Regions:
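Alpha-helical multi-pass membrane segments and their bilayer interfacial helix-loop junctions
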Residues: 1-247
Length: 247
């Protein structure tokens, strides 16, 4: 309530101050500093990227009076550019995550200008898939974060399409989760397998509830599917433990 009473100039000034202050404080921490300080720098710069996104969104919305999709595009682009410059493909997980979030928001906003939720979801999923591929090839450091972040984006994108494709969305998400589990197990990429399992635990109940909501066998089906997912999890854990060499 109080935030709404703050003038636009005050909001812009506050966001600009936070973005600049957190960036400057983080910039004082050198790469050779203690690990705790390096993590602090990552958190500060993440906050700076978030403030830059809020500033850009505020300008687009309250100053330019742009439509909602353009506001998301501006906010995401600002975060992606600022975080990308701080990241510069180095081992900086927080900046990697901030850049990915910015790219996803910007891509979703751009898709929203021309289409509806289905277009937004598909574009977000496509960006996530590209991020997974880059993590697979170890192009984006750290690769584990690229696999996990991109995988989550693909699953989220499938869910976003539900506003237009209520029947197809849960099936699409479940298919993506199954592919992640299968590929992760076959190639011993545990992060991708974990993302697939988490997606399965989310999309499987959704799929069963959506298509069989009036069936008396839903509780039994949920139980069987839950047991199946737990069995897959145990298999993955056993394969992973065997793949790790003994020291």
């Amino acid at each position: 309530q109080y935030w709404r009473e703050v003038p636009t100039a005050g909001r812009l000034g506050l966001f600009a101050l936070v973005a600049a202050a957190t960036w400057l404080v983080g910039a004082r921490i050198a790469d050779g500093a203690e690990p705790a300080l390096i993590r602090l720098r990552g958190a500060l710069w993440f906050a700076s990227s978030a403030a830059a996104a809020a500033l850009a969104g505020q300008v687009a919305g309250d100053v330019a009076h742009a439509r909602e999709s353009v506001v998301w595009l501006a906010a995401g682009a600002a975060a992606a550019v600022q975080a990308g410059l701080l990241w510069r493909l180095r081992d900086r997980p927080a900046q990697h995550l901030a850049c990915l979030a910015g790219v996803l928001v910007a891509a979703g906003g751009a898709a929203g200008i021309a289409g509806g939720p289905a277009a937004v979801g598909l574009v977000v999923a496509a960006v996530g898939a590209a991020w997974v591929a880059a993590g697979w090839l170890a192009v984006l450091p750290p690769p584990v974060l690229a696999l996990v972040g991109g995988g989550v984006a693909v699953l989220a994108g499938a869910g976003i399409t539900a506003a237009d494709w209520s029947d197809a969305a849960p099936l699409l998400g479940l298919a993506v989760a199954a592919v992640f589990v299968a590929v992760g197990v076959a190639t011993v990429r545990t992060p991708l397998t974990v993302v697939g399992l988490v997606g399965g635990f989310g999309y499987l109940p959704w799929t069963i509830g959506h298509f069989f909501a009036d069936s008396l066998g839903v509780p039994l089906a949920m139980l069987v599917c839950g047991v199946a997912l737990l069995a897959v999890t145990l298999v993955v854990l056993r394969r992973t433990s065997r793949a790790v060499p003994a020291h």
